[in-house]
Swiss-Prot record:
Belongs to the HflD family. Its main location: cytoplasm. It holds the Pfam family DUF489. Keywords: Cell inner membrane, Cell membrane, Cytoplasm, Membrane. It is a peripheral membrane protein. Gene3D superfamilies: HflD-like. One of its GO terms (cellular component) is cytoplasm. SUPFAM superfamilies: YcfC-like. It comes from Shewanella sp. (strain MR-7). This is High frequency lysogenization protein HflD homolog. It is found in: Cytoplasm; Cell inner membrane.
Length: 205
């Protein structure tokens, strides 16, 4: 298997895994604690030696690979809403990587959260609120806001809002890594078969 394509597909799976949780939260108001932790932990790995250092929860990653197959394959399971969120994340990622001040602020704020984890778990409400505020303060102001669809009763709850923003930050982290590994939007069209084949092979690892 092509190592670069494998790592790039891993990062793309990470984006979709976080986005799918956003969708589920917006509709149902609840999240799987292990999946949430897996996505949020990726934010904190800022100097990885490999993509595998970022995505250490294999069960969560496998869900991400299945989402890659659904979104890029010819199946009827392609989700237009997931695609819309993906387009929004990739657009914001481009703006972030062009903003030196934004990247510097992001690094500092993530370091603050890392220090907080000496006392709290990654899924603690205070930690999630801090991750959410990073997204609101730095990412959300870069461009058009991503409009989240869902159950209004769920979306009104502060903890749901915080989890959604924290997961969007996780999606951004994976998008940054995907781009660093050479990912381009045109690959999602012209290299679709190679990405699908890599995701299928990765599911067997």
């Amino acid at each position: 298997m092509n190592e670069q394509l494998h790592n790039r597909t891993m990062a793309f799976a990470g984006i979709l895994q976080a986005i799918a949780q956003v969708q589920h939260l917006a509709r149902h108001g609840e999240s799987d604690t292990d999946e949430l932790a897996a996505s949020l932990n990726t934010i904190l790995v800022t100097n990885p030696e490999s993509a595998a250092d970022v995505y250490q929860d294999k069960a969560a990653l496998h869900k991400g690979y299945k989402l890659v197959l659904n979104q890029l394959g010819d199946s009827s399971q392609k989700d237009v809403e997931i695609t819309r969120y993906l387009v929004g994340i990739l657009a914001l990622e481009r703006k972030l990587t062009r903003s030196n001040s934004g990247l510097a602020m992001l690094a500092e704020r993530i370091n603050q959260v890392n220090r907080q984890l000496h006392h709290f778990a990654i899924t603690d409400e205070q930690v999630i609120a801090n991750l959410a505020s990073i997204y609101s303060d730095i990412i959300s102001n870069l461009g058009p806001k991503i409009q989240i669809s869902g159950n209004p009763l769920c979306l009104q709850r502060p903890i749901v809002q915080h989890k959604i923003r924290a997961l969007l930050l996780a999606a951004m982290r994976s998008a940054v890594l995907w781009r660093q590994l050479g990912g381009k939007r045109r690959h999602l069209v012209f290299a679709r078969k190679a990405i699908i084949d890599t995701a299928k092979k990765s599911l067997t690892l």
